[in-house]
C-alpha cells in the first residue's frame, strides 16, 4: 500500500514537473524552428547582427571577469568572516536581483551619466559610459554579479575551515592556503556562478537600453527590429540568439560536469 501511494505521488510530481518543462521548452522550440536555415544564415551574414551578437558575448564576458576579480575575494570574506554589517552587505549584493532593471538603468545613469561625478571623472580619462561599451559592461556587472558572489560564497562555506588552519599551522601563508586549498575546493561553485552570471548578462535589456541604446547588443537589436518591422523581421534574430546561447550554455555545462567527475 505504501509503495502504491509513493508511486502515485511520484506520478503526480512527474506530471506537474512535465507541465513546467513544456511551459519553458515549447516557446523555445517553436521559435527555434520558425525560421529556415537559409533565412538564419542570411541573417547571420548581416554585419549589424554579427556585431551585436559579438558585442553581447564580449561585454558579458568582461563583466564576468571583473566580477571574478572583485567578487571572489568578497565571497571569501563573507564565508569566512563575521563582522558588523555583514547581513547588510549580503542584502546589498542581492538587491540587483529584485530591483526592476529599468530602475537599475536609471540608478546607474545617476552615477555614471555624463554630468554625474563618476561620469565626469572617467570622462577626463577618455572613458564614457552613456552610449558606449563600458556602460554596457557596467550594466551587466550590476544586474548579474549576485549570481557569482552568492555561488562563490556557498562554495567557500562548503570548504571545512579546519583545512586552512592545518595548513597555517604547518607554515603556509594565508595566500598559499587560499590558492592551494580553499579556491580549488570551491572552484566548481565559482565556475557555476560565472556561467550563470555570463548567461544572465547576455539576456539583459531593460537597464542596457537606458544606459547604452547604441552600440546595440543583441536584445536591443531584437527589440528595435520588432518595433520597427514586426515579428517576421525580428524572428530570425531571436532564433539565432536562442540557438547560440543554448549551444554555448550546454557546452559550458558539459565542461563543468567533466571537471566535477575528474575531481570526484
Predicted regions and their residues:
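Short coil/turn motifs that cap or connect alpha-helices
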Residues: 84, 173-174
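Extracytoplasmic catalytic/substrate-binding loops of multi-pass membrane glycan-assembly enzymes
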Residues: 216-217
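Hydrophobic positions on the alpha-helical face of helix-turn-helix-like DNA-binding modules
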Residues: 166-167, 177, 181, 222
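Glycine/proline-centered hinge or cleavage motifs at structural transition points of membrane proteins
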Residues: 170-171, 184
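Membrane-helix/interface signature in polytopic inner-membrane proteins
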Residues: 153-164, 174
Amino acid at each position: 500500500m505504501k509503495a502504491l501511494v509513493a508511486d502515485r505521488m511520484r506520478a503526480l510530481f512527474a506530471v506537474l514537473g512535465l507541465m513546467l518543462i513544456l511551459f519553458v521548452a515549447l516557446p523555445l522550440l517553436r521559435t527555434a524552428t520558425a525560421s529556415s536555415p537559409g533565412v538564419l544564415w542570411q541573417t547571420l551574414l548581416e554585419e549589424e547582427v554579427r556585431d551585436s551578437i559579438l558585442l553581447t558575448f564580449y561585454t558579458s564576458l568582461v563583466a564576468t571577469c571583473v566580477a571574478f576579480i572583485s567578487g571572489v575575494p568578497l565571497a571569501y570574506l563573507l564565508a569566512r568572516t563575521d563582522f558588523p554589517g555583514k547581513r547588510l552587505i549580503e542584502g546589498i549584493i542581492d538587491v540587483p536581483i529584485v530591483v526592476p532593471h529599468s530602475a537599475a538603468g536609471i540608478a546607474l545613469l545617476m552615477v555614471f551619466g555624463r554630468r554625474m561625478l563618476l561620469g565626469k571623472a572617467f570622462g577626463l580619462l577618455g572613458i564614457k559610459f552613456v552610449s558606449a561599451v563600458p556602460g554596457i559592461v557596467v550594466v551587466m556587472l550590476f544586474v548579474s554579479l549576485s549570481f557569482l558572489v552568492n555561488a562563490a560564497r556557498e562554495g567557500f562555506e562548503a570548504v571545512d575551515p579546519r583545512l586552512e588552519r592545518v595548513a597555517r599551522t604547518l607554515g603556509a601563508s594565508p595566500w598559499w592556503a587560499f590558492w592551494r586549498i580553499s579556491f580549488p575546493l570551491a572552484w566548481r561553485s565559482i565556475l557555476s556562478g560565472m556561467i550563470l552570471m555570463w548567461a544572465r548578462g547576455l539576456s539583459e535589456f531593460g537597464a542596457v537600453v537606458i544606459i547604452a541604446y547604441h552600440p546595440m547588443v543583441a536584445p536591443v537589436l531584437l527589440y528595435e527590429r520588432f518595433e520597427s518591422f514586426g515579428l517576421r523581421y525580428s524572428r530570425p534574430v531571436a532564433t539565432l540568439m536562442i540557438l547560440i546561447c543554448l549551444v554555448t550554455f550546454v557546452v559550458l555545462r558539459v565542461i563543468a560536469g567533466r571537471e566535477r567527475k575528474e575531481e570526484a
